[in-house]
C-alpha cells in the first residue's frame, strides 16, 4: 500500500528527497471515491513520471451546497487499495484544517473561462478549485499534473491559472473514460437508482446526435434545442445547460467554425451529471 501522508511537512520531506535524487514528480488531484477514470490518470502519470502522488481531498471550498458536500462519498481505504494496484508512490490525504488552517484568507479567482456554464450554476465553485489546486501545486512541487477532460471547464481554468501565475507545472488533459454504453465515469454515478443508471447515457447520446446534426448543416440553435428536449424526454428532471462553446475560452459559438466543445449539465434522480464532447 502506498504511504498515506497527512501533513504538508510529511509531503514536503518526501518530495524533497525525490527532487534531490533528480526525479520527476507527477500529481493527480482527486476528491477520492476513485473509479477507473481516476486510475487512468494515475497510470498516465506512472508512465511519464518517476514519482506519482495522488491527492485525496474533499475540498469544502468548491461546494456551494453544504448537502452536496455532506453526501460526497468518502472511501479512503478502498481508494488506497486501488492506487496500490497502479503503483503510486504516495497518497496525500490531508484534513481540511491542514489545507485551510485558522486565519486562512486567500482566494484565487480565474476570470473569464470560469464564469459561464458551471461557474454560472455553482457560484464560487471555480474559486475553490483554483485555490486548492494552486496550493496543491505549491505543496507537491509537481512537474506534471493530470486532469480528466470530463471536467473540461475545470481543465481550462487550471491551464489559465498555471499560465497566468507562471506555475512551473505541465498540465496534461486525459481523455474521458466511459462505460460501454457511453456514460462518463463519475463518482456521482453511484448515487443513481438502477432505473436512473439505465437512462443516464441519454445525455451523451443527445449530445452526439446534436454534434452530428450540426456537422450535417443543422443550425446550432436547432440542434441544441432538439438535444435538450431529448434529454428531458429520456427522464432527466432538468437541463442546466447544453451549449456549444469554443474549446479554449468557452465563448458561445453561433455556428461551427474552429474547435468547438459541446458541454452539458443535467439532473437525473436528483444527481447532477456533467459531460462534454468535441465538435
UniProtKB/Swiss-Prot annotation:
Where, by residue number, is the active site? Answer: 38 (proton donor)
Q: Which family does it belong to?
A: Belongs to the pantothenate synthetase family.
Keywords linked to the UniProt accession = ATP-binding, Cytoplasm, Ligase, Nucleotide-binding, Pantothenate biosynthesis
> In what pathway does it function?
Cofactor biosynthesis; (R)-pantothenate biosynthesis; (R)-pantothenate from (R)-pantoate and beta-alanine: step 1/1
Name recorded for this polypeptide: Pantothenate synthetase
Q: What quaternary arrangement does the UniProt entry report?
A: Homodimer.
Q: Which SUPFAM superfamilies match?
A: Nucleotidylyl transferase
What is the organism of origin for this protein?
Cereibacter sphaeroides (strain KD131 / KCTC 12085)
**Where in the cell is the protein located?**
Cytoplasm
Look up the EC number in the record and give it: 6.3.2.1
Q: What does this protein do?
A: Catalyzes the condensation of pantoate with beta-alanine in an ATP-dependent reaction via a pantoyl-adenylate intermediate.
Intrachain disulfide bonds: none
Among PANTHER family, the record links this protein to:
CYTIDYLATE KINASE/PANTOATE-BETA-ALANINE LIGASE, PANTOATE--BETA-ALANINE LIGASE
Which Pfam families does this UniProt record tie to the protein?
Pantoate_ligase
Annotated residues that bind beta-alanine are located at 62
A Gene Ontology biological process noted in the UniProt record is: pantothenate biosynthetic process
Which terms in the GO cellular component ontology are assigned?
cytosol
- Per UniProt, (R)-pantoate binds at 62, 154
Q: Name one GO molecular function term.
A: ATP binding
**Domain of life where this protein originates:** Bacteria
Which reactions fall under this protein's catalytic activity?
A: (R)-pantoate + beta-alanine + ATP = (R)-pantothenate + AMP + diphosphate + H(+)
Q: Which InterPro entries match?
A: Cyt_trans-like, Pantoate_ligase, Pantoate_ligase_C, Rossmann-like_a/b/a_fold
Q: Where does ATP bind?
A: 31-38, 148-151, 177, 185-188
Question: Gene for this protein?
Answer: panC
